[in-house]
C-alpha cells in the first residue's frame, strides 16, 4: 500500500497515519525528517541541501524527491509507505510520479482528510500539550480531568503560540491555496479519496479502512 495523506491542520492526519502504519506494517515517512537526517549525517544529498538552506533558499524539488526515493528504497518500505507532508505542490507531485513510475512503485491512493475551517479552529485553538510527557488534550473534545493540568504527571499544560484562532485561519487559507491544484492533479488520475474527518477518530478510521478495501 503506497499512500499520500492530504488534509489541513487539525484534520487528524497524524492519528490516522499511525493507525495505517499499524494496519499495513508500513513506515510513515516525513520529508522534514528525511531532510534533517541527511543534513545531520552529511550525506551527499544532505550537503547539497545544506548549501541551499544556508543561503536561505528552498531545497529544490528534484533534490527532495531524490531523498524521498532514497528512503523508499529502504527494506522497511518495500511493501509500501505513507507519505505525509509531501508533495505540497503540483511540480513536486509530477516529480514524485515520475520517480515512482521509474521504480515501478505507483501510488495506491491519495487520502484527503476533509474538515471545515470552523472545525479545524475548534480543534487547534483548544489544543493544549503537556511540556513534560507531550500528551495532547483538547479542552472541548478531550479535556484533562483538572483544568489545564496533565492527567499523567500534574504538569501545567501549554498551548502553541500559533494555535490562536487568527493564526490558525491564516494557516488554513494558505493550505487551501497551496493544495487545491494538488487535489485536482490527483483527482484527474483517479487517485484522490475524500474522507469526512469531522467525526470521531474511531469513525474516521473506519471510513479510512473502508475506503482502502480493495485498493492495492
Please identify what each model-predicted range represents.
Residues 1-216:
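Glycine-rich phosphate-binding loop of ATP-dependent small-molecule kinases
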Amino acid at each position: 500500500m503506497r499512500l499520500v495523506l492530504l488534509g489541513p491542520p487539525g484534520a487528524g492526519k497524524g492519528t490516522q497515519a499511525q493507525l495505517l502504519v499499524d494496519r499495513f506494517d508500513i513506515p510513515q515517512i516525513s520529508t522534514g525528517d528525511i531532510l534533517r537526517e541527511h543534513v545531520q549525517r552529511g550525506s551527499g544529498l544532505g550537503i547539497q541541501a545544506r548549501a541551499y538552506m544556508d543561503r536561505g533558499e528552498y531545497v529544490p524539488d528534484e533534490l527532495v524527491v531524490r531523498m524521498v526515493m532514497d528512503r523508499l528504497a529502504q527494506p522497511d518500505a518495500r511493501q509500501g509507505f505513507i507519505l505525509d507532508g509531501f508533495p505540497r505542490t503540483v511540480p513536486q507531485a509530477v516529480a514524485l510520479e515520475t520517480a515512482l513510475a521509474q521504480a515501478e512503485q505507483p501510488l495506491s491512493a491519495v487520502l484527503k482528510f476533509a474538515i471545515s475551517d470552523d472545525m479545524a479552529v475548534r480543534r487547534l485553538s483548544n489544543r493544549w500539550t503537556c511540556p513534560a510527557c507531550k500528551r495532547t488534550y483538547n479542552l472541548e473534545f478531550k479535556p484533562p480531568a483538572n483544568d489545564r493540568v496533565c492527567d499523567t504527571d500534574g504538569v501545567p499544560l501549554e498551548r502553541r503560540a500559533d494555535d490562536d484562532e487568527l493564526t490558525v485561519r491564516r494557516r488554513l487559507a494558505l493550505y487551501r491555496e497551496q493544495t487545491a491544484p494538488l487535489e485536482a492533479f490527483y483527482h484527474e488520475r483517479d487517485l484522490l479519496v475524500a474522507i469526512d474527518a469531522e467525526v470521531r477518530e474511531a469513525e474516521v478510521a473506519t471510513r479510512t479502512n473502508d475506503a482502502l478495501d480493495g485498493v492495492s
